[in-house]
Every structure is written in C-alpha cells, then in structure tokens.
C-alpha cells in the first residue's frame, strides 16, 4: 500500500513524493528514451554546364566536361577555349597560325573596322575582324610598326625609326621618307639584285629623271635642324623627283640608308649638297659622281647622318 506525503506551505499544499508503506523509499526515476539521430542525405551534385567564371578565368562545360581547343559563340561573343579548357583572355593568342585578340572577359575583340585597341595596357593594331595588321602602317596621321602578334612597337627603334611610349613614330616625316625610299627601290631596281646594284640603279635613275628647280632650298631655320633631309627627300619621292641638289642628296641618302649603308648629307657654303658614304662621294655635279674617291675641294657647312 502506498502513502502520499503532503507538504503544506501556507494555504496550499504540494505533493513531494510517493512513499511506500514499508519504509518510505522513493520509486526510481524513469529516463525517457531519446530518438536515434538520423543522417541527412547528401544532395546530388548538379553537373556543370555552359560558361562559368572560376576565379579569374572562364571555362565552358558540357555535362561537367570542359570544352577544349574550340571556338564557342555565346550571346553573340566569340570565345576560344585552350587545351587546358581556360578561355584565352587579356591579350593576343595564336590559333591555327593566326593571332587573335581577347579582352579581360575572354571575348574576342572584333572592332568592325581597322583600329588601335588597348588591352591590359598594351596597344594593338588590328583589322575589322581583330587580326593584326602587321608591318608599317600610317593611321590617323601617325606611323605605327606592328609586330606579328599585333602589338605596336613601343619604346624601341625599328629600321632606324624611333617609336615612343605611345606606340607611334616620334618623327612622322622620317618614317614616311623611309617607306617612300623603300617603294622607290622596289620600282626602280631588280628584286634579285645585290644592294650595291640596287643603289647604283636608283642613283642613276634619280640623276636622269630629276626635274631640277633652283628655288627648293631649305630655309635658314630648317638648316638649324637635322630633319630637313627627310622633308626634302620625301618631296622628291612624292613629286616626281622635283627638287634641287638638296633634294637629290637627301633622296640618294634615303635610298642608301634603306639598303643598309650609313650615308651622310654634306652641305657646303656654295649652296650645294652631296652624299658621303665610307669616304666616297655621291654627287649630281661633275658629271655625276658615284662612289668617287675624290671631288673638288670644299668646306663643310653641315654634315648630317641620315
């Protein structure tokens, strides 16, 4: 038989424990059983598909497999995915023998017209489809030299022409003169001839076909510079060999320079000019001198290395 002991506190009472009749021993406390932990199933990974940016690079996936060595057109933009699956980006990349240009988002640059474009701080000169326009190019009043990968020559000298930090020739007239001399050589000499034969052929062509006018002297101000030789040489090439001894000497020097010689244009107080190369004279006077060891005595007024 069980007795229940009651504790009275003021006006109320509380039942503290069930006591047995024999000795008042409390009955054991029963701990409820806790449910066993259940494991949450891992979600099935979603396969990668389409264009994804991973860190700083882009990849294109098809059912978790990255596309490699392939062009993809995505939302109207072209991407090239290399052998490692990473899209070409931030500059030039050679694909099947052709260089193409890509921006920081890995999109091929297609300007739609011949343009100078800047990618990652580097200037490139490309055609409408974004391919390099290599070699010498005059564009918007500036002369550029473009390497095979499309980069514009910068802070370097190519063929005697200095290119500045902005990627174009520091002296446009000098650059134009160089190209004019190159074209003249191509038109008036045999492509298979030696440089000496080319020089000789061009020299005598100038002697024979110059339209001599006496009033085309450099100005006193021009004589104070060394750049007048490029101006008067270019005038000869562009105006059907029209000029006088200053233009003749300058054009002869331009041709010699293009063929690998180191010519000097000499002016004398008599109002005349001629060319000297390795101590030999090239002059339209005295029956024309080509590689002559001597000429009549003279006093040097200006000596300009072309």
Regions found by a protein language model. Give the residues of each.
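Secondary-structure boundary elements
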Residues: 176-237
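Extracellular adhesion/carbohydrate-binding repeat motifs centered on closely spaced tryptophans
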Residues: 1-179, 219, 267-269, 274-279, ...
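Active-site neighborhood of thiol-dependent amide/isopeptide-bond enzymes
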Residues: 215-273
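Loop/turn elements at helix/coil->beta-strand transitions in domains of secreted/extracellular proteins
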Residues: 195-200, 257-262, 280
